[in-house]
Regions:
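Conserved Class I S-adenosyl-L-methionine
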Residues: 218-276
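N-terminal auxiliary segments of SAM/dcSAM-dependent transferases
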Residues: 1-32
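A short SAM/SAH-binding and catalytic strip from SAM-dependent methyltransferases
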Residues: 141-153
C-alpha cells in the first residue's frame, strides 16, 4: 500500500470515517457471524464492504452500466474499505487501482484484499481524488460511488478524473446530490456537520461534469426506489454483518438519508459519462 500524505483540508473527511479500530470491529463481526477470519471469501464480505446506498446492488448495476471488461485499467476513486475494487477484480478480472484519503480505510482495504486472495489484482494508495498521483491517460474507467458529497471543489475532482482517463474512457458515478429543499437532517453517512457536506443539484453536477470534459451517456435518478429499499431493510432486525459493524450510529445516519430523500433534501443519481 502506497502512502501519500493527505492535504490539511481532508481532516474533516478523515474524522468522519476513521475510528481507529475498523479492522477489529470487522473481525469481531465476522467471528460473530460464524466466519473463520483466517479463511474469508468475497461472499463473506458482501454485506459490509460497500459503503454507499443500496450497497452491493448499486455496485453490480454500475459495473454493468460502465461495461467494465478484464482488459480495462480501472481506478476506484474513493474506495473506502475496497468493496467496489474487489468486486471489479473478482467479477471482471480487471486490474484495479484503489485510492482513498482516509489512511485507515486503505489499511483495512489492503488487509481484506489479501485475505480474499485479490491482493495481486488491486493496488491501494492513500491519495486525494482532487490531486491524483497518476500520469495522464492512465485508466480506461474511473468508478466513484458516494464520494463527491465530501468535496467542495468538484471542478478539480472531475478535472482530475478526466485527466487520468484515456481517450474513450468512462466515468461511472453513484452519488448523492442536493434536492430542492434544505438543510439536510444530520447526521447522514457522509457528514455529521454541515461543514462536511458539499451537495450540489443534479443540474449543477451535470454542468460541472461537462465543464470538466465529460458527456452524459446514462443518467438516472433512483432516489425513491433506493429510499424504499433502505427504509424496508433498516426498519428490520440487522444481521451480524453489515456497515453498522464499523460505522458509528449507522442506522440513524441511513434513516436520516431516507428522510432527506423523502423530503427532497437529497437525491441519488446513477450515471455513466464518456470522455469528450
Amino acid at each position: 500500500m502506497t502512502q501519500v500524505k493527505p492535504a490539511e483540508t481532508d481532516g474533516l473527511t478523515i474524522a468522519q470515517y476513521s475510528t481507529g479500530d475498523i479492522r477489529q470491529r470487522i473481525e469481531t463481526a465476522l467471528s460473530a457471524a460464524g466466519k473463520d477470519i483466517t479463511d474469508i471469501s468475497t461472499g463473506d464480505l458482501a454485506m459490509l464492504e460497500d459503503f454507499h446506498s443500496l450497497g452491493r446492488i448499486a455496485t453490480v448495476a454500475l459495473i454493468e452500466l460502465a461495461q467494465i471488461e478484464a482488459h480495462d485499467r480501472v481506478l476506484d476513486a474513493g474506495t473506502g474499505i475496497g468493496g467496489t475494487a474487489r468486486m471489479i477484480a473478482a467479477e471482471r478480472g480487471s486490474s484495479v487501482t484503489a485510492v482513498d484519503v482516509t489512511p485507515e480505510y486503505c489499511e483495512v482495504a489492503t488487509w481484506l484484499n489479501d485475505a480474499v486472495g485479490l491482493g495481486d489484482k488491486i493496488d491501494v494508495q492513500v491519495a486525494d481524488v482532487t490531486d491524483l498521483p497518476f500520469d495522464a491517460a492512465s485508466f480506461d474507467v474511473v468508478v466513484s460511488q458516494h464520494v463527491q458529497m465530501n468535496i467542495a471543489d468538484k471542478h478539480r475532482l472531475y478535472s482530475e478524473a478526466r485527466r487520468v482517463l484515456a481517450p474513450g474512457g468512462r466515468l461511472a458515478l453513484w452519488d448523492v446530490t442536493a434536492g430542492s429543499a434544505e438543510p439536510l437532517h444530520l447526521p447522514v453517512p457522509w457528514a455529521s456537520s454541515p461543514q462536511q457536506s458539499h451537495l450540489v443539484t443534479p443540474a449543477r453536477l451535470i454542468d460541472i461534469l461537462g465543464e470538466a470534459g465529460f458527456a452524459v451517456s446514462h443518467w438516472d435518478d433512483l432516489s425513491q426506489a433506493a429510499a424504499d429499499v433502505m427504509r424496508d431493510f433498516f426498519n428490520g432486525d440487522q444481521p451480524a454483518l453489515g456497515l453498522h459493524s464499523f460505522v458509528p450510529d449507522f442506522q440513524t445516519k441511513v434513516m436520516n438519508l431516507v428522510r432527506n430523500i423523502a423530503e427532497d433534501r437529497a437525491r441519488l443519481i446513477q450515471a455513466v459519462l464518456s470522455v469528450t
